[in-house]
Amino acid sequence: MRTELNQGLIDFLKASPTPFHACASLAQRLESAGYQRLDEREPWPTQSGGRYYVTRNDSSLIAIQLGRRSPLEGGLRLVGAHTDSPCLRVKPQPELNRQGFWQLGVEVYGGALLAPWFDRDLSLAGRVTFRRAGRVESQLIDFKQPIAVIPNLAIHLNREANQGWAINAQNELPPILAQVAGDERGDFRALLAEQLQREHEINADVVLDFELCFYDTQSAALIGLNQDFIAGARLDNLLSCHAGLQALLAAGDRESCVLVCTDHEEIGSCSTCGADGPFLEQVLGRLLPDGDAFVRIMQQSLLVSADNAHGVHPNYADRHDANHGPKLNAGPVIKVNSNQRYATNSETAGFFRHLCFDVEVPVQSFVVRSDMGCGSTIGPITASRLGMRTVDIGLPTFAMHSIRELAGSHDLTHLVKVLTAFYSSPLLP
């Protein structure tokens, strides 16, 4: 099971260089399992026992199984994760010519660790909107091959490089695509039109706009003498999306189960398709009874907000509270914060711990040092919007928000096991 799950994650990461591609990958796997796509612009002919999924903005997805037992009797079991990761996104008018090199201006998306982006073989992927035969259409593209690089400055020209050199995102991050003659800047939209034709055999009249990000072409891999680790881009938080999907597909059909994978978590979730937008409320509002019955269902339901946790780093162990340093390959982590940066309370933490005990999965706790700030997740946002009990959990990770992150290769099995038990649990607290 461990080998199969890890290989499935590696394949999912490779197929999902952007939130758009992640959403498409999830949708494809759901359809293969018999889930029916619902269009938000059309009526929804749903029924008990039905399995459905909905997408918004091509980058967020909600899948729901309406169980044999009514949600009014047993509530909903929800797992939440996010599809986006910190990256470098191409600006609307990106063409640059500096010293005879064609470069693209980029904007930093989210709280990225910038230094690891240098000297990587980068490709480009995302969504392109274009006009064809008088109609406006959109299509996903992925160059797949390494087409760009951000070279470091030699240490001979920057003697302070190893003494905490600050990176200027405006000047030092534009990737190099090619050498050009004279003042030529290159035509980026023409390049995108060529890619549309090459990848999809689409002859666009004109490329109107795009949402594209660079990514590292190095594939995720199992590493270490004993393959104890999995290294790859976007583990935060596609690892949780993958685990949630595997658990949903493995769960029984008695209970009503929901998988929520939203975009824009890394920048605050405030969007039409983010956790702080109306997407989940509107989908549940159309699938469930309204009014008093809806509130009753919400109060019987539970959300597991799954987002990677900070594992205790052997070189920086002092960055953790001594009693709350999660270890890789030691099971999922319950995240606690008294200032509600995480939505966990004693009842929801206790229930998750109970599930772990039942399926013999090790479980850990994380509390940030009292003299450090704490990040947050979609957990508190969803809990406050729906009034739903929530537990924040995640798998321990090193190098979070780097271009290449590291997690334990045993932990994915632990997480899928306990999430499957959660989806199948006949009782909630």
Swiss-Prot record:
Pfam families, alphabetized: Peptidase_M18
One MF annotation (Gene Ontology) recorded for this entry: metallopeptidase activity
GO CC aspect terms: cytoplasm
Keywords associated with the record: Aminopeptidase, Hydrolase, Metal-binding, Metalloprotease, Protease, Zinc
GO annotation terms (biological process): proteolysis
Superkingdom per UniProt: Bacteria
Coiled-coil regions, chain positions: none
Binding-site positions, Zn(2+): H82, H156, H401
Keyword NADP: no
Enzyme class, UniProt record, top EC level: hydrolase
Entry's EC annotation: 3.4.11.-
Cofactor: Zn(2+)
Similarity comment: Belongs to the peptidase M18 family.
Protein name per UniProt: Probable M18 family aminopeptidase 2
Protein's gene: apeB
